[in-house]
């Protein structure tokens, strides 16, 4: 049943009271009174002499006769109608009524609706709207009215039945006893017979017929101060209009002593799980879903509750409170006794019965009580004897029902309203005298209130004296003719009054306020405020010129300002920042409002700020302290009016005053309207578990807070801004939310806060890793627009995460809070913009030529930067200009206030960017679908697959980021509004944000094979990482790409250990059969390359597969008799797939790629079981096979050196290679085909298939400008038998030509001089912008006669290779021959300038040390031959013979003789250099290896030490000093292992080591500068030095190239390098300085050139003279790198800055 609105009407004496209801409703009066209960109602002049205990008993009857059950009525409030209950007092008529439906009037059993403090679901804003007060009840008459709210069914108050007149109700006689008759009225309240019509107030003895109470032993404390527990109320319930019954409270009445008038307060916790059918039998009261259940018809006397231990539950135990001893008191009685010493009057305290049930819910006895039915009368028992029970059974049942109730003193403290101190009574008498000194009285009053203990009555007296003093001073001031004296007197009086008011508000007087009932507290507070205001305006009216007076005491700041209107230029603000440090509240009065209220050109304003007044002017539960009220609300509940509705569903709001009270008044304090509203900023006292702020003012008439005329402008967690159109005392009301049921987070509480911190931390870590990856491994990628876009996205996301983390810890008052919100706004807009541009970039890539080649597009990226950050900053700037406060008005520092500006500048731009990103993604998918159906070349399909993968991942990234931001937004909004779904959104945010960080790491780091390899390399190269990480197989590169066919690029071996895991394509039978296993290809696994990539040892129980150096197109064959027991791939020889970094170089190192049509000649397996390929110049030499199809043994090889001695072979480096499987016509990658894993290549995060490639890993030195581009033909290299007769002569001719070229280059270098380093930096290779490869062919010249026997295909490949390799002398016709993986046209290169200094690493590779001296029976000439063979670029060891027998010629002998001479000269130079170098390091001079090298090799003085087999830590093998220690140790270990295996192979096969015959080109090679580009430098395992140094090093005295190939070595021989700019030149002044400073300068980056070398090497073109070449940092080197588009890029090293 819907409860009608409870209303109150007033009419002053002589006026007409009109009550009117809506059509269809009638008036239902609840109570009425004609008289006066409030001093403020109908008191325009502030008269305080009127009586406030004035009442007419028949007021309700008179009003009922005129208005009951009518739609409207009017009653004149006059004594002629009601009589004159208090002559001399101006009276008013007060009526409390409801408008109910006319249909309800036919039900006569309905009881009147209870007052609003029981029925209202929400408290009215007027705290005590009725203004009703209870009479003091002095004397031995009737006791005072109860301080409990009047409950339904109240007939009257004993001894004063006319206080509230209730309409008669239907009653029923429920039980009769001989001693008394008890009538139960509508509410279940007991009305005793004639023998018990008065309330006992005799503490010593009882006169109600009950025996005296026994001595009790209480197990609980009944002390008043201790009752404010979580399970007990701490104070009394209010009787005011807005005093609401606590939520979760059930008021039960009807249990009490015989003759009591107001029953007992029984509260229980309702159960939400009440069994069905347990309907309450108590009366159902119409009204707003509330029900009051009553215990019907329980007569404790009749029930036999008159003795024994059970009676202990019906008495409150004795206790001490307020300096009084309170004896045992029966439940329902009021203990009355005189006031404490020094005070006059009486003190009272009531004993009530109260029950608490735990939160577990339903209690069985609660159902027993609520379901009790009235006992049938005697007549009914005759007709229905089954319902009659004997008295003993009734007593037992009552005892059971009441056993969980306990008696409690209520309220928490006694009522001392009538207690007045003697000294304040004296002051009251003095102030009423005619000639009293007001200043003296005011001083005495301030002294008494600060030093004496006050009681409740003293508060009333003090505020009355304050008002009386102000009224008398108003009349007395006219007696002072002097203006100064008048102002001084009033100012002194004001100071005393302010001090007195501060004393009353002091914490020491809190008990005095608690002595008053809630109504008296409000009345005293109102009187105090008006008294202060009257005295302040008394001073303001006295001042006749502009002046400001400030009175500041402990708890009150009062300011009186008199301003001239002509001086008011702006709004007036109170208080000043330095006046009131207790609070940050402020009030601002607009200038127009002040001018409108001026008088005589002056504006008089009174401001006041109060401390601790908020604890007095409580809107509800004023008799509770805050802690107790929260506890009380949390543990109690209000029941629903319907019996089938679970109890506790309707929860009452608890409102508190959540700010200090601040006041402003104009016009002598009158309630005037202002032309412009004032602005108030009030700080919240409580920021947690509060919500719904309301701006209110204190209504003097109603003694309550009201919101009329005030509105809330904005609010956040700590402050609220209000606007009011009038002046008075202002504050903020807020609802308290039960923190046990609802968690309104400070930001995030408990686990939620911890989880959010963890989530943000994880995301930030992964974003930082992604950013560092892009920065540190930037050489992995070709710098592109996509890389820049994702870098910007990561930066924005990082800023968002960090700002969010900082913002949740800030308060809205801090300046930092606004900045966080501003920057977060900008970061979110920028991040969404970058996502949009990323989608647009993918779309533009698909619709333009960018699909084929993605390079750095600086103009486009700059445009992206401008649009993203420019637009974001512009939008934020516009938002700041429009309304800066929108960034500081929200509850949290991470959100803007949700207003129109928020949606216009934040929501709409974000949605636009997201929609645009999704739109471009959709268009990109459409284009990709179309392109996939068309015939594209392999490269286009590769790029298309890359873009497809990018779009997929980006779309998922966008969706995940949207989920993160949406969940965060809804969580913050829900937390602010205390929404139950806030936790759900919070945990969604935690999950999504964590997934976002993981996705960034996996998608942009782990998913990319290039980055994975760099991670593994980083792990292996840092010794501080755990051994398990550096030795795990997961740290070894798995990017093995086999060649075309099922057996290409595989390794065959026999394993005698346990059966390994069979690779794909290998049958189990083949594995079990040793012979078949010999021929079964085994794909190269990670185990096979572990030795080349880490220093980890494998399980010694298994045989290891050994892969030696070699270069071949077919299968790498390793016989069963593998050596060494270790799997070792030589340094620099790890198989890599297309586009991957070389094993011993950093990211972005050089790669050279050949077209797959250039079929290299596969080498057969020789007797040594080694497979390798010897290709000195990479294009012109083909190893002929023997009759058996295999290479000759090392013995045969060295015996066949007759013609090879003068062969023009160039020193070279042997490289491994591999091929990717053919991707087919459509370029689509077939995963798992043939069991060959395909490694990814491509763009930043793509995984695509590339065309079949042959991959090399050289590093190059730049050549000098002016070198011819021709490539000489070496017939000796192609067919050694043809070169038998002229090899030596031809070689001598070549050496002579090189010496001439060297001389020319020296002259040119001395003459050239650049004007500045800037010009020098500009001399770089030009970028060749290549068009699409059209496949055009260039006519080949006729081959030389000695090569006519070879096939056309071989000659075509040989010729084109000589004209490729970044040859700048060629035109576009050559470069447009075909794509990389296309026709037989050779590779296509692009040459660009590398500005990344991180890609360039210079090492000294010309100087070597010798680790041990070989003392076998080998002559010096043999070692010379070995050294010459090494210098000539022979295979690693016994690489095969080029001829069929042992041939020796005169030219060869002469060449060997020259080698011996050069060796002796080199030894002398080495000794001289050692002398100079020994000054730097004397310890190394004594080293055994250095001593041996000093005798046998010209680079013996290299400062790098090499550790032996037992001690690897000192073995650096001449490694570059710049390399890290881990790589030095790794390479040293591999060199040692190679040496051991080589020696074992020689001893095993019994090789006599006859080095009389050497491979072609084994003549002496001149030294060259070894500064190279790459990590491994000249000591790479694929280098010359690594091949033969184990045995031949002792005889290696001549300079050997030792390093990776120079450009002219790779591209041609002699003067056949590509023409490059003179980037290696320095100005003449610098060269002269260098010559002066270092006449014998040798740097770590340059080799030493022999003056006496008759056959200078072409590499000397780089540094023609040892004293003239510039320092190492001035050298510039050329390198080639395979980009993500499978195109070789030649990089020219930038000059050092």
From Swiss-Prot:
Glycosylation, residue list: 128, 242, 288, 327, 384, 641, 689, 716
Disulfide linkage: 695-722, 710-724
Feature type site, description Cleavage: 727-728
Localization terms from the record: Cell membrane
Membrane topology: Multi-pass membrane protein
Span of domain SUEL-type lectin: 11-100
UniProt keyword terms in alphabetical order: Cell membrane, Disulfide bond, G-protein coupled receptor, Glycoprotein, Lectin, Membrane, Phosphoprotein, Receptor, Transducer, Transmembrane, Transmembrane helix
One Pfam family in the UniProt entry: GAIN
Quaternary data: Forms a heterodimer, consisting of a large extracellular region non-covalently linked to a seven-transmembrane moiety.
Protein's recorded name: Latrophilin Cirl
Species name: Drosophila melanogaster (Fruit fly)
Upper classification of the organism: Eukaryota, Metazoa, Ecdysozoa, Arthropoda, Hexapoda
